[in-house]
Amino acid sequence: MKKILVLGAGRSAVTLIKYLLENSISNNWQVTVADFSIELAERAVANHENGKAIFFNVTDEIQRKSEIENADIVISMLPASLHITVAKDCVSLVKNMVTASYVSPEIADLDEKAKQAGVLLLNEIGLDPGIDHMSAMQVIDEIKENGGDLTSFKSFCGGLVHPDYDNNPWNYKFTWNPRNVVLAGQGTAQYIKQGNYKYIPYTKLFERTELMEVLDAGEFEGYANRDSLGYRYAYGLEDIPTLFRGTLRRKGYCKAWNMFVQLGMTDDTYEVENSENLTYRAFINLFFPYNNELSVEQKFCSYLNLSQDSEEFSKIEWLGIFTDTIVGLKDATPAKILQKICEEKWTLDSEDKDMIVMQHQFEYVQNGEQKKLNSSLLVFGDDPRYTSMAKTVGLPVAIAAKLILTGKIKSTGVKIPTTKNIYIPVLKELEDNGINFVEELV
């Protein structure tokens, strides 16, 4: 019986664990789910005959090494900063490891040791990164093999609320880590356009958006991700003139969110004095010049050059930020207070479903002819637990683990899924599970 160790039973792991347990009998697997919260682990295992839930403390070296040594493969769904600790043990104990997270410099440094040990450390095989890599590389390789020369590659992804449950003026609800949403875009975005390097500072990021339609899901806007440039090398596009990666939101979101950015309310570098006793109204008032003649609403509109009947103002007002609700968070940064305000309005309700939207836009020359191809993905969640986000992060990880255990992926070292031996079988099984791209010449 092959033993699979899953570290972490949080939101991103539920579909992954469900897949492993459902396939455990036919594949003769034992699945151990380890989490600091035994309740989370037990809920994920759900008394399955081939599942086991255990309390796990990643900082307990004796327990960590013991559990890894007993496994045939390790799947780490822990916070990204903890992967390196697990990865070092996997190399020394000769165990393959799979994660959905970006390759950190520390993980990258293990490449040679992993190769010497005959160990595969497969990373970036979730949604973004993960499905984006695999689906992009499949098209890129096909274009190159058919004699095409890529001139532009743009890629966008977003986690949003399902259209049937899109019932607020922002057309947005949290489907993933709320903190990441509030802090999104901080730092300068970098990309390349027609051979020219371009930079967008954070204060301009949400003003510089691209509009697009994705299949029958309607209109979206995309803002730039922090670093698109590294993907030239990851995808073998070193000489491509245009490369851009972005995040998708519904039209109108970015203009309204930019109000918070301009006021400084997404700042996470300092704590607000007496934050726990402030009202939301007093909190937003902190960011305006002193004026005891204007209302907070009037200051907001005056400072940001808006009218009170604008869409941006109505979105901000709907969040309840002008009310006398107490913040109730001690020693909180502006970003943490804003997160709390948003969570009260943007949390998925008990019946809500989410949606993943991804689109790759390729431009290339083939036989002297300029061509454009869009490759688009829509995935819908089942409920607030088995979300489209959990599906698209967890299923590629689970499928890759199965392919490694069955000897169909034989690589060693630190890898991401940009090669055919990985992306072809993973994408095939994702398609069997309803996660498939639609290609359109435009």
Task: State where each predicted segment sits.
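Conserved N-terminal Rossmann-fold NAD(P)-binding element of oxidoreductases
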Residues: 4-8
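N-terminal Rossmann-fold NAD(P) dinucleotide-binding loop
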Residues: 13-14
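Helix N-cap at the beta1-alpha1 junction of Rossmann-like dinucleotide-binding domains, i.e.
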Residues: 36-40, 104
